[in-house]
A protein has these predicted regions:
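Chalcogenol-based redox active-site neighborhoods
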Residues: 1-193
Protein backbone atom coordinates (compact mmCIF):
# COMPACT_ATOMS: atom_id res chain seq x y z
CA UNK A 1 0.00 0.00 0.00
CA UNK A 2 1.56 3.28 -1.09
CA UNK A 3 -0.07 6.62 -0.38
CA UNK A 4 -3.38 4.90 0.32
CA UNK A 5 -3.34 2.93 -2.94
CA UNK A 6 -2.64 -0.73 -3.63
CA UNK A 7 0.54 -1.26 -5.67
CA UNK A 8 1.03 -4.76 -7.06
CA UNK A 9 4.74 -4.70 -7.90
CA UNK A 10 6.65 -2.50 -5.47
CA UNK A 11 10.45 -2.59 -5.74
CA UNK A 12 13.30 -0.77 -4.02
CA UNK A 13 14.83 -0.51 -7.51
CA UNK A 14 12.49 2.46 -7.94
CA UNK A 15 14.84 4.45 -5.67
CA UNK A 16 18.15 3.23 -7.15
CA UNK A 17 20.52 6.05 -7.96
CA UNK A 18 18.13 8.66 -6.59
CA UNK A 19 17.43 8.11 -2.90
CA UNK A 20 18.68 6.46 0.22
CA UNK A 21 16.15 4.05 1.71
CA UNK A 22 15.31 3.37 5.33
CA UNK A 23 13.68 -0.04 5.08
CA UNK A 24 12.16 -1.07 8.38
CA UNK A 25 10.37 -4.24 9.39
CA UNK A 26 7.77 -4.45 12.12
CA UNK A 27 6.01 -7.52 13.57
CA UNK A 28 2.27 -7.05 12.93
CA UNK A 29 -0.50 -4.64 12.11
CA UNK A 30 -3.01 -3.92 14.89
CA UNK A 31 -0.51 -4.53 17.69
CA UNK A 32 1.04 -2.36 20.39
CA UNK A 33 4.58 -1.02 19.84
CA UNK A 34 4.20 -1.08 16.05
CA UNK A 35 1.81 1.88 15.65
CA UNK A 36 4.06 4.05 17.82
CA UNK A 37 6.93 3.35 15.44
CA UNK A 38 4.91 3.91 12.26
CA UNK A 39 3.61 7.23 13.58
CA UNK A 40 7.14 8.22 14.69
CA UNK A 41 8.46 7.62 11.16
CA UNK A 42 5.53 9.63 9.75
CA UNK A 43 6.27 12.53 12.13
CA UNK A 44 9.87 12.64 10.84
CA UNK A 45 9.04 11.89 7.20
CA UNK A 46 9.76 15.45 6.02
CA UNK A 47 13.20 15.24 7.66
CA UNK A 48 13.96 11.98 5.84
CA UNK A 49 12.71 13.44 2.56
CA UNK A 50 14.92 16.53 3.05
CA UNK A 51 17.84 14.08 3.19
CA UNK A 52 16.83 12.36 -0.09
CA UNK A 53 15.71 9.34 1.91
CA UNK A 54 12.63 7.20 1.32
CA UNK A 55 11.00 5.41 4.23
CA UNK A 56 9.45 1.99 3.57
CA UNK A 57 7.75 -0.21 6.17
CA UNK A 58 7.35 -3.99 5.86
CA UNK A 59 5.43 -6.60 7.83
CA UNK A 60 4.25 -10.12 7.09
CA UNK A 61 0.62 -8.99 7.04
CA UNK A 62 -1.45 -8.81 3.85
CA UNK A 63 -2.11 -5.65 1.86
CA UNK A 64 -5.76 -5.83 2.99
CA UNK A 65 -4.64 -5.84 6.61
CA UNK A 66 -2.38 -2.82 5.94
CA UNK A 67 -5.29 -1.05 4.25
CA UNK A 68 -7.64 -1.70 7.18
CA UNK A 69 -5.05 -0.44 9.67
CA UNK A 70 -4.48 2.68 7.56
CA UNK A 71 -8.23 3.38 7.79
CA UNK A 72 -8.21 3.06 11.59
CA UNK A 73 -7.88 6.34 13.54
CA UNK A 74 -4.87 6.87 15.75
CA UNK A 75 -7.24 7.21 18.74
CA UNK A 76 -8.25 3.58 18.14
CA UNK A 77 -4.71 2.21 17.76
CA UNK A 78 -4.59 2.71 14.01
CA UNK A 79 -2.13 4.34 11.65
CA UNK A 80 -4.45 6.67 9.77
CA UNK A 81 -2.31 9.44 8.26
CA UNK A 82 0.74 7.29 7.47
CA UNK A 83 1.69 8.11 3.88
CA UNK A 84 4.91 6.20 3.14
CA UNK A 85 4.78 2.74 1.49
CA UNK A 86 3.86 -0.32 3.55
CA UNK A 87 4.91 -3.58 1.93
CA UNK A 88 2.86 -6.73 2.50
CA UNK A 89 5.38 -9.56 2.86
CA UNK A 90 2.68 -12.17 3.37
CA UNK A 91 4.81 -14.87 1.71
CA UNK A 92 7.69 -13.99 4.11
CA UNK A 93 10.27 -13.86 1.28
CA UNK A 94 11.50 -10.34 2.03
CA UNK A 95 11.71 -10.87 5.80
CA UNK A 96 13.60 -14.10 5.23
CA UNK A 97 16.00 -12.47 2.74
CA UNK A 98 16.85 -9.72 5.25
CA UNK A 99 17.19 -12.36 8.01
CA UNK A 100 14.58 -10.80 10.28
CA UNK A 101 11.97 -13.57 10.13
CA UNK A 102 11.00 -14.86 13.57
CA UNK A 103 9.29 -18.20 14.14
CA UNK A 104 9.76 -21.92 13.71
CA UNK A 105 10.26 -22.58 10.02
CA UNK A 106 12.34 -24.40 7.46
CA UNK A 107 12.79 -24.61 3.72
CA UNK A 108 11.54 -27.64 1.78
CA UNK A 109 13.29 -29.29 -1.19
CA UNK A 110 11.49 -26.90 -3.57
CA UNK A 111 12.77 -23.83 -1.71
CA UNK A 112 9.43 -23.02 -0.09
CA UNK A 113 9.16 -21.85 3.51
CA UNK A 114 7.38 -24.29 5.80
CA UNK A 115 6.19 -23.08 9.20
CA UNK A 116 5.36 -24.80 12.45
CA UNK A 117 4.57 -21.52 14.26
CA UNK A 118 3.50 -17.99 13.41
CA UNK A 119 6.17 -16.23 11.37
CA UNK A 120 6.50 -12.49 11.89
CA UNK A 121 9.34 -10.04 11.40
CA UNK A 122 11.65 -8.74 14.09
CA UNK A 123 12.05 -4.96 14.23
CA UNK A 124 14.81 -4.75 11.63
CA UNK A 125 16.01 -1.48 10.13
CA UNK A 126 18.26 -1.23 7.08
CA UNK A 127 19.83 1.93 5.67
CA UNK A 128 20.40 1.34 1.97
CA UNK A 129 22.55 3.71 -0.08
CA UNK A 130 21.75 5.03 -3.54
CA UNK A 131 23.65 2.10 -5.09
CA UNK A 132 21.45 -0.43 -3.28
CA UNK A 133 24.07 -1.42 -0.68
CA UNK A 134 23.04 -1.94 2.95
CA UNK A 135 25.26 0.46 4.92
CA UNK A 136 23.68 0.11 8.36
CA UNK A 137 21.42 -2.45 9.98
CA UNK A 138 20.00 -3.02 13.42
CA UNK A 139 17.50 -5.61 14.67
CA UNK A 140 15.45 -5.19 17.83
CA UNK A 141 13.57 -7.96 19.59
CA UNK A 142 9.78 -7.78 19.43
CA UNK A 143 9.09 -5.76 22.63
CA UNK A 144 11.78 -3.12 21.97
CA UNK A 145 10.74 -0.09 19.94
CA UNK A 146 13.37 1.68 17.87
CA UNK A 147 14.59 5.29 17.95
CA UNK A 148 13.65 7.11 14.74
CA UNK A 149 16.06 9.95 15.54
CA UNK A 150 18.88 7.38 15.48
CA UNK A 151 17.83 6.36 11.97
CA UNK A 152 18.08 10.03 10.92
CA UNK A 153 21.50 10.27 12.57
CA UNK A 154 22.70 7.27 10.60
CA UNK A 155 21.51 8.87 7.33
CA UNK A 156 23.45 12.00 8.33
CA UNK A 157 26.54 9.92 9.15
CA UNK A 158 26.43 8.14 5.80
CA UNK A 159 26.03 11.36 3.83
CA UNK A 160 28.83 12.99 5.87
CA UNK A 161 31.14 10.10 5.00
CA UNK A 162 30.18 10.21 1.33
CA UNK A 163 30.68 13.98 1.12
CA UNK A 164 33.85 14.34 3.19
CA UNK A 165 35.54 10.93 3.11
CA UNK A 166 35.84 11.09 6.90
CA UNK A 167 34.49 8.41 9.21
CA UNK A 168 32.08 9.14 12.05
CA UNK A 169 33.34 8.27 15.55
CA UNK A 170 31.18 7.12 18.45
CA UNK A 171 28.37 9.52 19.33
CA UNK A 172 28.96 11.57 16.18
CA UNK A 173 26.17 13.92 15.15
CA UNK A 174 25.92 16.66 12.52
CA UNK A 175 28.23 19.55 13.32
CA UNK A 176 30.72 17.38 15.17
CA UNK A 177 34.14 16.40 13.87
CA UNK A 178 34.68 13.34 11.74
CA UNK A 179 38.10 11.78 11.38
CA UNK A 180 40.40 10.72 8.59
CA UNK A 181 40.30 6.92 8.26
CA UNK A 182 43.98 6.32 9.04
CA UNK A 183 46.31 6.11 12.06
CA UNK A 184 47.21 9.79 11.91
CA UNK A 185 43.53 10.72 11.67
CA UNK A 186 42.50 8.72 14.72
CA UNK A 187 45.50 10.02 16.71
CA UNK A 188 44.60 13.59 15.78
CA UNK A 189 40.94 13.07 16.64
CA UNK A 190 41.64 11.41 19.99
CA UNK A 191 44.16 14.08 20.97
CA UNK A 192 41.44 16.74 20.52
CA UNK A 193 38.57 14.86 22.13
Amino acid sequence: VNGGEFVSHFSLDHYAGEKYVVLFFYPKDFTFVCPTELHAFQEKLAEFEARDTAVVGVSTDTEQCHWAWLQTPKSQGGIQGVTYPLVADSNKVISSAYDVLNGEFGVDEDGNLTASSEMIAYRGLFLIDKSGVVRHQVVNDLPLGRNVDEALRMVDALTFFEQHGEVCPANWSPGKDGMKPNHAGVADYLSKH
